[in-house]
Protein backbone atom coordinates (compact mmCIF):
# COMPACT_ATOMS: atom_id res chain seq x y z
CA UNK A 1 0.00 0.00 0.00
CA UNK A 2 1.30 3.45 -0.90
CA UNK A 3 2.58 5.70 1.88
CA UNK A 4 1.70 9.38 1.62
CA UNK A 5 2.39 12.72 3.23
CA UNK A 6 0.88 16.09 2.36
CA UNK A 7 2.81 19.34 2.74
CA UNK A 8 0.61 22.38 3.28
CA UNK A 9 1.69 25.94 4.10
CA UNK A 10 0.60 28.89 6.16
CA UNK A 11 0.80 31.05 3.00
CA UNK A 12 2.09 31.15 -0.55
CA UNK A 13 5.89 31.03 -0.85
CA UNK A 14 6.26 29.35 2.55
CA UNK A 15 8.46 26.74 0.88
CA UNK A 16 6.00 23.92 0.18
CA UNK A 17 7.24 23.18 -3.34
CA UNK A 18 10.88 23.05 -2.30
CA UNK A 19 10.21 20.83 0.71
CA UNK A 20 8.16 18.45 -1.45
CA UNK A 21 11.05 18.31 -3.94
CA UNK A 22 13.54 17.69 -1.14
CA UNK A 23 11.47 14.88 0.32
CA UNK A 24 11.09 13.34 -3.14
CA UNK A 25 14.88 13.31 -3.57
CA UNK A 26 15.41 12.05 -0.01
CA UNK A 27 13.06 9.09 -0.48
CA UNK A 28 14.42 8.44 -3.98
CA UNK A 29 17.93 8.21 -2.50
CA UNK A 30 16.58 5.60 -0.07
CA UNK A 31 15.51 3.47 -3.03
CA UNK A 32 11.80 4.26 -2.90
CA UNK A 33 9.56 4.78 -5.92
CA UNK A 34 8.30 8.27 -5.11
CA UNK A 35 6.31 10.88 -7.03
CA UNK A 36 4.94 14.36 -6.27
CA UNK A 37 1.28 15.29 -6.59
CA UNK A 38 -0.58 18.60 -6.58
CA UNK A 39 -4.23 18.31 -7.54
CA UNK A 40 -4.55 21.96 -8.58
CA UNK A 41 -1.84 24.48 -9.35
CA UNK A 42 -2.35 28.13 -10.29
CA UNK A 43 0.67 29.31 -12.20
CA UNK A 44 1.85 30.94 -15.41
CA UNK A 45 4.97 28.77 -15.32
CA UNK A 46 4.18 25.57 -17.16
CA UNK A 47 5.92 22.77 -19.02
CA UNK A 48 5.10 20.41 -21.86
CA UNK A 49 5.63 16.70 -21.27
CA UNK A 50 6.95 14.23 -23.82
CA UNK A 51 3.34 13.43 -24.73
CA UNK A 52 2.47 17.09 -25.39
CA UNK A 53 0.55 17.64 -22.12
CA UNK A 54 0.79 20.91 -20.20
CA UNK A 55 1.48 20.87 -16.45
CA UNK A 56 2.85 23.16 -13.74
CA UNK A 57 6.62 23.55 -13.57
CA UNK A 58 6.70 23.00 -9.80
CA UNK A 59 5.68 19.38 -10.28
CA UNK A 60 8.24 19.04 -13.07
CA UNK A 61 10.93 20.28 -10.68
CA UNK A 62 9.68 17.82 -8.04
CA UNK A 63 9.54 14.94 -10.54
CA UNK A 64 13.16 15.62 -11.50
CA UNK A 65 14.08 15.49 -7.82
CA UNK A 66 12.26 12.15 -7.57
CA UNK A 67 14.24 10.85 -10.54
CA UNK A 68 11.18 10.28 -12.73
CA UNK A 69 9.87 11.80 -15.94
CA UNK A 70 7.25 14.54 -15.54
CA UNK A 71 3.76 13.05 -15.84
CA UNK A 72 0.64 15.19 -16.20
CA UNK A 73 -1.03 13.00 -13.56
CA UNK A 74 1.20 14.72 -11.00
CA UNK A 75 -0.71 17.98 -11.64
CA UNK A 76 -4.12 17.16 -13.13
CA UNK A 77 -5.56 20.69 -12.79
CA UNK A 78 -3.61 23.76 -13.92
CA UNK A 79 -5.11 27.25 -13.72
CA UNK A 80 -3.41 29.93 -15.83
CA UNK A 81 -4.73 33.43 -15.07
CA UNK A 82 -5.51 35.43 -18.20
CA UNK A 83 -6.49 38.54 -16.25
CA UNK A 84 -7.43 39.51 -12.69
CA UNK A 85 -10.80 37.76 -12.91
CA UNK A 86 -10.42 34.83 -15.26
CA UNK A 87 -8.21 31.78 -15.73
CA UNK A 88 -7.64 29.22 -18.42
CA UNK A 89 -8.60 25.86 -16.92
CA UNK A 90 -6.40 22.95 -18.00
CA UNK A 91 -7.23 19.37 -17.00
CA UNK A 92 -4.83 16.50 -17.66
CA UNK A 93 -2.78 18.70 -19.96
CA UNK A 94 -5.57 19.99 -22.21
CA UNK A 95 -7.64 23.19 -22.12
CA UNK A 96 -11.18 22.84 -20.82
CA UNK A 97 -12.31 26.47 -20.89
CA UNK A 98 -11.73 29.99 -19.59
CA UNK A 99 -13.62 30.56 -16.34
CA UNK A 100 -14.07 33.27 -13.75
CA UNK A 101 -13.58 32.42 -10.07
CA UNK A 102 -17.28 31.93 -9.32
CA UNK A 103 -17.85 29.62 -12.30
CA UNK A 104 -14.78 27.56 -11.49
CA UNK A 105 -15.73 27.34 -7.79
CA UNK A 106 -18.97 25.66 -8.87
CA UNK A 107 -17.40 23.57 -11.64
CA UNK A 108 -14.46 22.06 -9.76
CA UNK A 109 -16.67 19.69 -7.78
CA UNK A 110 -17.18 17.74 -11.00
CA UNK A 111 -13.41 17.13 -11.10
CA UNK A 112 -13.23 15.31 -7.75
CA UNK A 113 -13.85 11.74 -9.01
CA UNK A 114 -11.43 12.34 -11.89
CA UNK A 115 -8.74 13.63 -9.52
CA UNK A 116 -9.27 10.62 -7.26
CA UNK A 117 -8.88 8.25 -10.21
CA UNK A 118 -5.69 9.98 -11.35
CA UNK A 119 -4.26 9.85 -7.84
CA UNK A 120 -5.10 6.18 -7.47
CA UNK A 121 -3.32 5.36 -10.72
CA UNK A 122 -0.15 6.94 -9.29
CA UNK A 123 -0.66 5.17 -5.96
CA UNK A 124 -0.85 1.82 -7.75
CA UNK A 125 2.57 2.40 -9.34
CA UNK A 126 4.61 3.90 -6.47
CA UNK A 127 5.76 3.39 -2.88
CA UNK A 128 5.36 6.99 -1.72
CA UNK A 129 3.39 10.04 -2.86
CA UNK A 130 4.36 13.46 -1.52
CA UNK A 131 1.38 15.79 -1.95
CA UNK A 132 1.51 19.57 -2.03
CA UNK A 133 -1.23 21.97 -1.04
CA UNK A 134 -1.76 25.48 -2.41
CA UNK A 135 -1.61 28.80 -0.60
CA UNK A 136 -3.08 28.14 2.85
CA UNK A 137 -5.60 25.57 4.13
CA UNK A 138 -7.21 28.36 6.16
CA UNK A 139 -8.88 30.12 3.22
CA UNK A 140 -12.21 29.84 5.04
CA UNK A 141 -14.15 31.55 2.23
CA UNK A 142 -13.21 28.73 -0.17
CA UNK A 143 -12.96 25.68 2.06
CA UNK A 144 -16.46 24.36 1.43
CA UNK A 145 -15.35 23.23 -2.05
CA UNK A 146 -11.63 22.78 -1.54
CA UNK A 147 -9.87 20.24 -3.76
CA UNK A 148 -6.23 21.10 -3.11
CA UNK A 149 -5.62 21.44 0.65
CA UNK A 150 -7.62 19.69 3.38
CA UNK A 151 -10.20 18.70 0.78
CA UNK A 152 -7.54 16.76 -1.10
CA UNK A 153 -6.11 15.29 2.11
CA UNK A 154 -9.58 14.03 2.99
CA UNK A 155 -10.09 12.53 -0.48
CA UNK A 156 -7.10 10.23 -0.07
CA UNK A 157 -6.87 10.12 3.74
CA UNK A 158 -3.41 11.73 3.79
CA UNK A 159 -1.72 13.04 6.95
CA UNK A 160 -0.64 16.67 6.76
CA UNK A 161 2.47 18.60 7.82
CA UNK A 162 2.21 22.40 7.90
CA UNK A 163 5.14 24.54 6.69
CA UNK A 164 5.60 28.08 8.01
CA UNK A 165 8.09 30.69 6.75
CA UNK A 166 9.88 32.39 9.65
CA UNK A 167 11.95 34.65 7.37
CA UNK A 168 8.99 36.95 6.71
CA UNK A 169 8.22 37.34 10.43
CA UNK A 170 5.14 36.43 12.45
CA UNK A 171 5.72 32.70 12.20
CA UNK A 172 3.99 31.72 15.44
CA UNK A 173 0.95 33.85 14.68
CA UNK A 174 0.71 32.28 11.22
CA UNK A 175 0.96 28.75 12.66
CA UNK A 176 -1.56 29.39 15.43
CA UNK A 177 -3.97 31.32 13.22
CA UNK A 178 -3.90 28.68 10.50
CA UNK A 179 -4.53 25.81 12.91
CA UNK A 180 -7.29 27.62 14.80
CA UNK A 181 -9.14 28.38 11.55
CA UNK A 182 -9.23 24.71 10.61
CA UNK A 183 -12.27 22.59 11.36
CA UNK A 184 -11.89 20.05 14.14
CA UNK A 185 -11.64 17.11 11.73
CA UNK A 186 -9.03 19.02 9.71
CA UNK A 187 -6.95 19.74 12.81
CA UNK A 188 -7.04 16.02 13.57
CA UNK A 189 -5.41 15.38 10.19
CA UNK A 190 -2.57 17.83 10.93
CA UNK A 191 0.30 15.82 12.41
CA UNK A 192 3.28 18.15 12.47
CA UNK A 193 4.77 21.57 11.77
CA UNK A 194 8.00 22.52 10.00
CA UNK A 195 9.45 25.99 10.50
CA UNK A 196 11.24 27.01 7.32
CA UNK A 197 13.94 29.54 6.36
CA UNK A 198 15.32 30.07 9.88
CA UNK A 199 18.38 32.25 10.43
CA UNK A 200 20.36 32.39 13.66
CA UNK A 201 20.62 30.38 16.87
CA UNK A 202 17.83 27.84 17.19
CA UNK A 203 18.13 28.02 20.99
CA UNK A 204 16.44 31.42 20.79
CA UNK A 205 13.55 29.79 18.96
CA UNK A 206 13.01 26.97 21.44
CA UNK A 207 10.74 28.83 23.91
CA UNK A 208 8.43 29.76 21.03
CA UNK A 209 8.39 26.17 19.79
CA UNK A 210 7.42 24.90 23.22
CA UNK A 211 4.64 27.48 23.54
CA UNK A 212 3.18 26.85 20.08
CA UNK A 213 3.22 23.10 20.71
CA UNK A 214 1.39 23.62 23.99
CA UNK A 215 -1.16 25.95 22.38
CA UNK A 216 -1.89 23.72 19.39
CA UNK A 217 -0.92 20.24 20.59
CA UNK A 218 0.86 19.78 17.25
CA UNK A 219 4.58 18.90 17.37
CA UNK A 220 7.21 20.92 15.54
CA UNK A 221 9.14 18.18 13.74
CA UNK A 222 11.70 20.33 11.98
CA UNK A 223 13.41 23.71 11.73
CA UNK A 224 14.96 24.22 8.30
CA UNK A 225 17.76 26.79 8.08
CA UNK A 226 17.71 29.43 5.38
CA UNK A 227 19.81 28.01 2.57
CA UNK A 228 20.99 29.71 -0.58
CA UNK A 229 20.27 26.79 -2.88
CA UNK A 230 20.05 27.60 -6.58
CA UNK A 231 16.65 26.10 -7.30
CA UNK A 232 13.91 27.14 -9.71
CA UNK A 233 11.27 29.39 -8.17
CA UNK A 234 7.83 28.68 -9.60
CA UNK A 235 5.56 30.85 -7.43
CA UNK A 236 4.82 34.32 -8.83
CA UNK A 237 5.33 35.68 -5.30
CA UNK A 238 9.03 34.92 -5.75
CA UNK A 239 9.24 37.55 -8.50
CA UNK A 240 9.25 40.21 -5.79
CA UNK A 241 12.58 38.81 -4.63
CA UNK A 242 14.21 38.93 -8.06
CA UNK A 243 17.17 41.20 -8.65
CA UNK A 244 16.40 44.67 -10.03
CA UNK A 245 19.88 46.21 -9.64
CA UNK A 246 22.86 46.00 -11.97
CA UNK A 247 25.95 44.22 -10.69
CA UNK A 248 28.59 46.52 -12.16
CA UNK A 249 31.35 43.95 -11.62
CA UNK A 250 29.70 41.42 -13.94
CA UNK A 251 30.94 40.78 -17.46
CA UNK A 252 27.46 41.07 -18.97
CA UNK A 253 24.29 42.94 -18.05
CA UNK A 254 21.14 41.05 -19.09
CA UNK A 255 17.85 42.89 -18.64
CA UNK A 256 14.56 40.97 -18.60
CA UNK A 257 11.36 42.95 -19.05
CA UNK A 258 9.16 42.06 -16.06
CA UNK A 259 5.79 42.05 -17.80
CA UNK A 260 2.67 42.28 -15.58
CA UNK A 261 1.49 38.91 -16.94
CA UNK A 262 4.91 37.30 -17.34
CA UNK A 263 4.84 33.54 -17.91
CA UNK A 264 7.56 30.91 -17.73
CA UNK A 265 10.08 33.14 -15.98
CA UNK A 266 11.78 29.83 -15.12
CA UNK A 267 13.31 30.22 -18.61
CA UNK A 268 15.84 32.57 -17.03
CA UNK A 269 16.97 30.51 -14.03
CA UNK A 270 19.88 29.18 -16.08
CA UNK A 271 21.08 32.75 -16.72
CA UNK A 272 20.89 33.63 -13.03
CA UNK A 273 23.25 30.83 -11.99
CA UNK A 274 26.05 31.60 -14.47
CA UNK A 275 29.15 33.27 -12.98
CA UNK A 276 29.90 36.91 -13.81
CA UNK A 277 26.49 37.46 -15.41
CA UNK A 278 24.18 40.15 -14.02
CA UNK A 279 20.50 39.35 -14.57
CA UNK A 280 18.02 42.03 -13.60
CA UNK A 281 14.27 42.41 -14.03
CA UNK A 282 12.99 45.73 -15.39
CA UNK A 283 9.58 47.01 -14.31
CA UNK A 284 9.85 50.65 -15.38
CA UNK A 285 11.66 53.01 -17.73
CA UNK A 286 13.95 54.40 -15.03
CA UNK A 287 15.57 50.98 -14.56
CA UNK A 288 16.29 50.31 -18.26
CA UNK A 289 19.90 51.50 -18.31
CA UNK A 290 22.26 50.28 -21.04
CA UNK A 291 22.14 46.47 -20.98
CA UNK A 292 24.12 44.13 -23.20
CA UNK A 293 21.02 42.06 -23.90
CA UNK A 294 17.29 42.71 -23.50
CA UNK A 295 14.95 39.74 -23.18
CA UNK A 296 11.19 40.01 -23.58
CA UNK A 297 9.67 36.94 -21.90
CA UNK A 298 6.49 35.01 -22.47
CA UNK A 299 3.10 36.42 -21.49
CA UNK A 300 -0.32 34.95 -20.73
CA UNK A 301 -1.92 38.07 -22.21
CA UNK A 302 0.38 39.33 -24.92
CA UNK A 303 -1.80 42.17 -26.20
CA UNK A 304 -2.33 43.63 -22.73
CA UNK A 305 1.38 43.35 -21.94
CA UNK A 306 2.18 45.07 -25.24
CA UNK A 307 -0.10 47.88 -24.11
CA UNK A 308 1.91 48.00 -20.85
CA UNK A 309 5.15 48.47 -22.82
CA UNK A 310 3.53 51.37 -24.68
CA UNK A 311 2.12 53.05 -21.58
CA UNK A 312 5.28 52.63 -19.49
CA UNK A 313 7.59 54.08 -22.13
CA UNK A 314 9.47 50.78 -22.38
CA UNK A 315 8.31 50.26 -25.97
CA UNK A 316 10.15 53.36 -27.12
CA UNK A 317 13.17 52.51 -24.97
CA UNK A 318 13.45 49.03 -26.51
CA UNK A 319 13.05 50.45 -30.02
CA UNK A 320 15.76 53.06 -29.43
CA UNK A 321 18.02 50.40 -27.92
CA UNK A 322 17.56 48.17 -30.98
CA UNK A 323 18.19 51.08 -33.38
CA UNK A 324 21.54 51.56 -31.65
CA UNK A 325 22.63 47.97 -32.36
CA UNK A 326 21.28 46.53 -29.11
CA UNK A 327 20.58 42.80 -28.93
CA UNK A 328 16.95 41.80 -28.21
CA UNK A 329 15.57 38.29 -27.81
CA UNK A 330 11.85 37.59 -27.50
CA UNK A 331 10.52 34.28 -26.18
CA UNK A 332 6.99 33.16 -27.13
CA UNK A 333 4.80 36.20 -26.31
CA UNK A 334 7.97 38.30 -26.40
CA UNK A 335 8.59 37.03 -29.94
CA UNK A 336 5.07 38.04 -30.93
CA UNK A 337 5.63 41.55 -29.49
CA UNK A 338 8.78 42.01 -31.59
CA UNK A 339 6.69 41.95 -34.76
CA UNK A 340 4.68 44.61 -36.58
CA UNK A 341 1.27 43.77 -35.17
CA UNK A 342 -0.79 41.18 -33.32
CA UNK A 343 -4.36 40.25 -34.22
CA UNK A 344 -6.87 38.60 -31.89
CA UNK A 345 -10.14 38.60 -33.86
CA UNK A 346 -11.78 36.00 -31.61
CA UNK A 347 -10.54 37.74 -28.44
CA UNK A 348 -8.72 34.60 -27.35
CA UNK A 349 -6.40 36.50 -25.00
CA UNK A 350 -8.09 39.80 -24.24
CA UNK A 351 -10.78 42.25 -25.29
CA UNK A 352 -8.36 43.87 -27.73
CA UNK A 353 -8.61 42.65 -31.32
CA UNK A 354 -5.45 44.29 -32.67
CA UNK A 355 -2.38 46.08 -31.39
CA UNK A 356 0.85 47.32 -32.94
CA UNK A 357 4.01 45.53 -31.90
CA UNK A 358 7.55 46.83 -31.49
CA UNK A 359 8.16 46.60 -35.23
CA UNK A 360 11.64 45.15 -34.79
CA UNK A 361 10.86 42.03 -36.82
CA UNK A 362 9.01 41.73 -40.11
CA UNK A 363 6.39 39.41 -38.61
CA UNK A 364 2.67 39.39 -37.84
CA UNK A 365 0.84 37.18 -35.33
CA UNK A 366 -2.76 36.05 -35.25
CA UNK A 367 -4.19 34.34 -32.16
CA UNK A 368 -6.13 31.11 -32.66
CA UNK A 369 -8.37 29.03 -30.42
CA UNK A 370 -6.07 26.00 -30.67
CA UNK A 371 -3.07 25.91 -28.33
CA UNK A 372 0.19 24.39 -29.53
CA UNK A 373 1.88 22.31 -26.81
CA UNK A 374 4.93 20.37 -27.95
CA UNK A 375 8.43 19.31 -27.00
CA UNK A 376 10.88 20.00 -29.82
CA UNK A 377 14.44 19.40 -30.92
CA UNK A 378 16.14 21.31 -33.69
CA UNK A 379 19.12 23.28 -34.97
CA UNK A 380 19.52 27.07 -34.90
CA UNK A 381 20.53 29.22 -37.87
CA UNK A 382 24.08 29.00 -36.46
CA UNK A 383 23.96 25.17 -36.45
CA UNK A 384 23.61 24.89 -32.67
CA UNK A 385 21.59 21.87 -31.44
CA UNK A 386 18.68 22.95 -29.25
CA UNK A 387 15.73 21.44 -27.45
CA UNK A 388 12.83 22.93 -25.54
CA UNK A 389 9.07 23.21 -25.65
CA UNK A 390 6.32 25.36 -27.12
CA UNK A 391 3.16 26.67 -25.43
CA UNK A 392 1.27 29.24 -27.49
CA UNK A 393 -2.01 30.10 -29.15
CA UNK A 394 -0.54 32.49 -31.69
CA UNK A 395 0.56 31.74 -35.24
CA UNK A 396 3.34 34.00 -36.50
CA UNK A 397 4.02 34.70 -40.17
CA UNK A 398 7.44 35.95 -41.27
CA UNK A 399 7.95 38.61 -43.90
CA UNK A 400 10.66 38.86 -46.54
CA UNK A 401 13.12 40.72 -44.31
CA UNK A 402 13.62 37.89 -41.82
CA UNK A 403 15.05 34.41 -41.75
CA UNK A 404 14.02 31.57 -39.41
CA UNK A 405 15.77 31.22 -36.06
CA UNK A 406 15.61 27.46 -35.91
CA UNK A 407 14.85 24.39 -38.00
CA UNK A 408 12.72 22.01 -35.95
CA UNK A 409 13.54 18.35 -36.60
CA UNK A 410 11.35 16.48 -34.10
CA UNK A 411 8.10 17.19 -32.26
CA UNK A 412 7.09 15.13 -29.22
CA UNK A 413 9.69 12.56 -30.20
CA UNK A 414 8.40 12.14 -33.74
CA UNK A 415 10.29 13.29 -36.82
CA UNK A 416 8.75 16.50 -38.13
CA UNK A 417 10.40 19.37 -39.94
CA UNK A 418 9.33 23.01 -39.81
CA UNK A 419 10.82 26.43 -39.10
CA UNK A 420 10.61 28.36 -35.85
CA UNK A 421 11.10 31.99 -35.01
CA UNK A 422 12.64 34.88 -36.88
CA UNK A 423 15.88 36.85 -37.05
CA UNK A 424 16.36 40.38 -38.32
CA UNK A 425 18.69 41.14 -41.21
CA UNK A 426 21.40 42.46 -38.86
CA UNK A 427 21.04 39.36 -36.60
CA UNK A 428 20.50 41.54 -33.50
CA UNK A 429 16.79 40.80 -33.09
CA UNK A 430 15.75 37.20 -32.43
CA UNK A 431 12.31 35.80 -31.78
CA UNK A 432 11.46 32.20 -30.96
CA UNK A 433 8.62 30.11 -29.56
CA UNK A 434 11.09 27.78 -27.81
CA UNK A 435 10.87 27.88 -24.02
CA UNK A 436 14.06 26.60 -22.42
CA UNK A 437 16.21 27.96 -25.24
CA UNK A 438 18.86 29.25 -22.80
CA UNK A 439 19.12 25.80 -21.18
CA UNK A 440 21.07 24.70 -24.27
CA UNK A 441 24.68 25.22 -23.22
CA UNK A 442 26.25 25.51 -26.69
CA UNK A 443 23.74 28.16 -27.72
CA UNK A 444 24.19 30.02 -24.43
CA UNK A 445 27.98 29.96 -24.57
CA UNK A 446 27.98 31.30 -28.12
CA UNK A 447 25.52 34.02 -27.11
CA UNK A 448 27.75 35.16 -24.24
CA UNK A 449 30.79 35.21 -26.53
CA UNK A 450 28.93 37.24 -29.15
CA UNK A 451 27.84 39.81 -26.56
CA UNK A 452 31.35 40.08 -25.12
CA UNK A 453 32.86 40.47 -28.61
CA UNK A 454 30.50 43.38 -29.24
CA UNK A 455 32.00 45.01 -26.11
CA UNK A 456 35.54 44.35 -27.41
CA UNK A 457 36.16 41.88 -24.60
CA UNK A 458 37.63 38.40 -24.69
CA UNK A 459 35.38 35.35 -24.77
CA UNK A 460 33.47 34.17 -21.72
CA UNK A 461 36.12 32.79 -19.33
CA UNK A 462 33.92 30.29 -17.49
CA UNK A 463 32.52 26.94 -18.45
CA UNK A 464 28.76 27.18 -18.94
CA UNK A 465 26.96 25.59 -16.00
CA UNK A 466 24.89 22.77 -17.46
CA UNK A 467 21.39 22.87 -16.04
CA UNK A 468 20.76 19.14 -15.63
CA UNK A 469 24.01 18.49 -13.76
CA UNK A 470 23.51 21.62 -11.66
CA UNK A 471 19.99 20.59 -10.68
CA UNK A 472 21.12 17.12 -9.61
CA UNK A 473 23.70 18.64 -7.28
CA UNK A 474 21.20 21.07 -5.79
CA UNK A 475 18.55 18.36 -5.29
CA UNK A 476 21.05 16.28 -3.33
CA UNK A 477 22.02 19.30 -1.21
CA UNK A 478 18.34 19.95 -0.52
CA UNK A 479 17.68 16.35 0.50
CA UNK A 480 20.67 16.41 2.85
CA UNK A 481 19.45 19.67 4.38
CA UNK A 482 16.00 18.23 5.09
CA UNK A 483 17.34 14.94 6.41
CA UNK A 484 19.58 16.80 8.85
CA UNK A 485 16.90 19.18 10.12
CA UNK A 486 13.63 17.24 10.08
CA UNK A 487 12.98 14.50 12.64
CA UNK A 488 12.71 11.88 9.93
CA UNK A 489 11.79 9.12 12.36
CA UNK A 490 8.77 11.20 13.36
CA UNK A 491 7.86 11.97 9.76
CA UNK A 492 8.04 8.31 8.80
CA UNK A 493 5.79 7.40 11.73
CA UNK A 494 3.28 9.99 10.51
CA UNK A 495 3.37 8.45 7.04
CA UNK A 496 2.71 4.99 8.49
CA UNK A 497 -0.27 6.27 10.45
CA UNK A 498 1.46 5.98 13.82
CA UNK A 499 0.77 8.56 16.50
CA UNK A 500 3.51 10.95 17.56
CA UNK A 501 3.45 13.26 20.54
CA UNK A 502 4.76 16.72 21.30
CA UNK A 503 8.40 16.24 22.21
CA UNK A 504 10.69 18.15 24.53
CA UNK A 505 13.62 17.32 22.27
CA UNK A 506 15.28 20.53 21.13
CA UNK A 507 15.92 20.82 17.37
CA UNK A 508 19.50 21.54 16.35
CA UNK A 509 20.19 23.39 13.13
CA UNK A 510 22.61 21.58 10.82
CA UNK A 511 23.84 23.50 7.80
UniProtKB/Swiss-Prot annotation:
Domain GATase cobBQ-type: 251-443
CDD domains found in the cross-reference section: CobQ_N, GATase1_CobQ
Active site annotation, chain numbering: 332 (nucleophile), 435
Keywords: Cobalamin biosynthesis, Glutamine amidotransferase
GO biological process, one term: cobalamin biosynthetic process
Gene3D superfamilies the record matches: 3.40.50.880, P-loop containing nucleotide triphosphate hydrolases (3.40.50.300)
Database matches in InterPro entries: Class_I_gatase-like (IPR029062), CobQ/CobB/MinD/ParA_Nub-bd_dom (IPR002586), CobQ_GATase1 (IPR033949), CobQ_N (IPR047045), CobQ_synth (IPR004459), GATase_3 (IPR011698), P-loop_NTPase (IPR027417)
Keyword Zinc part of the UniProt annotation: no
Tagged with keyword Zinc: no
Pathway assignment: Cofactor biosynthesis; adenosylcobalamin biosynthesis
Cross-referenced SUPFAM superfamilies: Class I glutamine amidotransferase-like, P-loop containing nucleoside triphosphate hydrolases
Example GO molecular function: catalytic activity
Its job: Catalyzes amidations at positions B, D, E, and G on adenosylcobyrinic A,C-diamide. NH(2) groups are provided by glutamine, and one molecule of ATP is hydrogenolyzed for each amidation.
Record-linked HAMAP family: CobQ
Similarity annotation: Belongs to the CobB/CobQ family. CobQ subfamily.
Descriptive protein name: Cobyric acid synthase
Species of the source: Listeria innocua serovar 6a (strain ATCC BAA-680 / CLIP 11262)
Species classification: Bacteria, Bacillati, Bacillota, Bacilli, Bacillales
